[in-house]
Curated annotation (Swiss-Prot):
NCBIfam families per record: MG423
InterPro entries: Metallo-B-lactamas, RibonucZ/Hydroxyglut_hydro, RMMBL, RNase_J, RNase_J_2, RNase_J_arc, RNase_J_b_CASP, RNase_J_CS
Regulation: Inhibited by imidazole.
Temperature-dependent activity: Optimum temperature is 60 degrees Celsius for nuclease activity on RNA.
Positions annotated to bind Zn(2+) 1: H81, H83, H151, D173
Name the UniProt record assigns to this protein: Ribonuclease J
GO cellular component, one term: cytoplasm
Organism: Methanocaldococcus jannaschii (strain ATCC 43067 / DSM 2661 / JAL-1 / JCM 10045 / NBRC 100440)
């Protein structure tokens, strides 16, 4: 018997997640993501027009050339959820493998959009929808199970590969939200059942391992937004809320609050249109009937003209640009590149924390500084993370009781912090906790 886990991407950084599991020559790929901060560094780059080798060189997508040295055949590409750091490299890499792409309904719809926008490669891999709670035989020896989990995007799952040698559980990304705004609670029964049946290896995200306690549920963010928006004296002023375009639950909360305020909710931005439009089309979420969505620049321009003409106080704008990204709607508004001109006491609510890297921090600081100079009231803190904190990770380890652990989706500070937690639970670095670099392979050999 030979089972290998190949760390292709996401084992030295946050992002560009990609892992391969080789079971006696039958290979399953888990996720194909991009590294978002590298996209920002190369801000003039249109990824859709570039060759995969250029993107590998820039550190934007995983370097899957390591797969040339792996003996076996790829049988499936399995996606855990729809964030770009997990699916963004599909248009660049999937065509190399004669294998279907498997994901939940929302994830597959997002992948379809990514493939349609690709200008360099012709991606023809079959797309297979698998719902949370369902299983599918990938080969006679490997069964894939999707366990429902919560994260900051709907339809997220824990993919589990059931093999003759034990299960491989892929925990990128998750939180335990017992009060979700959209969707259901995690399937704790299924998680514990997998643990009882025997987990050979658990691959776990580490993004928020350095935060004590447990990550609060999404309903807390909803309450904070109500506090900011309903309690403030802003009846006569413009209100703009900015958050992650993929955070459908958060956007649902904001649009519902707009309705309570008697304001028409307006979504602005291409990514807002993509993520929210798909979620609404497939029935994942029900937004207020008067919701308006504008994606392309000309329609956004026209929408803002109408808002100014009819009165800012009649609308609540939900815009892209919470990280201060140049070219995002909020950044363009703050630099007077749209018909919407900020006035004193207009409100901007940031319902997202800055992504922790220097470039994001600098861009966000510049945006906030510009808004303050214009007399804008700024509200921050109406946010909860979509990632597990330390005690969530401890619970997961106790339920799964894996023989081996591979920390991932983080730099070495984060994976080392996860190792400390694992050692508190009786594991030992180098024995059953394994810190891998991108391109490295961990082999398990045993007799059944």
């Amino acid at each position: 018997m030979k089972l290998e886990i190949i760390a292709i991407g996401g084992y030295e950084e946050v992002g560009r997640n990609m892992t391969a599991v080789n079971v006696d020559g039958e290979i399953i790929i888990l996720d194909m993501g991009i590294r978002l901060d590298r996209v920002l560094i190369h801000e003039d780059t249109d990824i859709s027009k570039l060759h995969s080798l250029e993107l590998i060189e820039k550190g934007i997508i995983p370097n899957d050339t390591v797969m040339k040295n792996i003996e076996g055949e790829v049988k499936a590409i399995v996606l855990s959820h729809g964030h770009l750091d997990h699916i963004g490299a599909v248009p660049k890499l999937a065509h190399r493998y004669n294998a279907p792409i498997i994901g939940t309904p929302y994830t597959i719809e997002l992948v379809k959009r990514e493939i349609l926008s690709e200008k360099k490669f012709d991606v023809r891999n079959p797309l297979i929808v698998l719902n949370a709670g369902e299983s599918i035989d990938l080969t006679p020896n490997i069964t894939l199970e999707f366990i429902r989990i919560t994260h900051s995007i709907p339809d997220s799952v824990l993919p589990v590969l059931h093999t003759p040698y034990g299960s491989i559980v892929y925990g990128n990304d998750f939180k335990f939200d017992n009060f979700p705004v959209v969707g259901e609670r995690p399937d704790y029964r299924a998680i514990k059942k997998v643990g009882k049946n025997g987990v050979l290896c658990f691959i776990s995200e580490t993004t928020r391992i350095n935060h004590e306690g447990k990550t609060p549920p999404e309903i807390i963010a909803s309450g904070l937004l109500k506090n900011d928006l309903l309690a403030a004296d802003n009846d006569k002023h413009g209100i703009i809320v900015t958050t992650f375009s993929s955070h459908i639950a958060r956007i649902k909360s904001i649009t519902d609050i707009a309705e309570k305020m008697g304001r028409t909710p307006v979504l602005l931005g291409r990514s807002m249109m993509r993520f929210c439009g798909i979620a609404q089309d497939i029935g994942l979420v029900k937004f207020p009937e008067d919701l308006r969505i504008y994606g392309d620049p000309s329609s956004i321009e026209m929408a803002l003209k109408n808002i100014v003409k009819e009165g800012k106080e009649k609308y609540l704008i939900i815009a892209t640009g919470h990280q201060g990204e140049e070219g995002a709607v909020l950044s363009r508004m703050a630099t007077n590149k749209t018909p919407y001109k900020f006035e004193k006491y207009d409100c901007v609510v940031f319902s997202a924390d800055p992504i922790p890297n220097p470039m994001n921090a600098a861009q966000r600081y510049m945006l906030e500084s510009r808004l303050k100079l214009l007399g804008v009231r700024i509200f921050k803190g109406a946010h909860v993370s979509g990632h597990a904190a330390k005690e969530d990770h401890r619970d997961m380890l106790r339920w799964l009781n894996p023989e081996h652990i591979i920390p991932s989706h983080g730099d070495f500070n984060l994976t080392a912090e996860y190792t400390k937690l694992a050692e508190e639970e009786g594991y030992r670095l180098g024995e059953d906790v394994h810190l891998l670099r991108n391109g490295q392979c961990l082999s398990f050999e045993r007799i059944i």
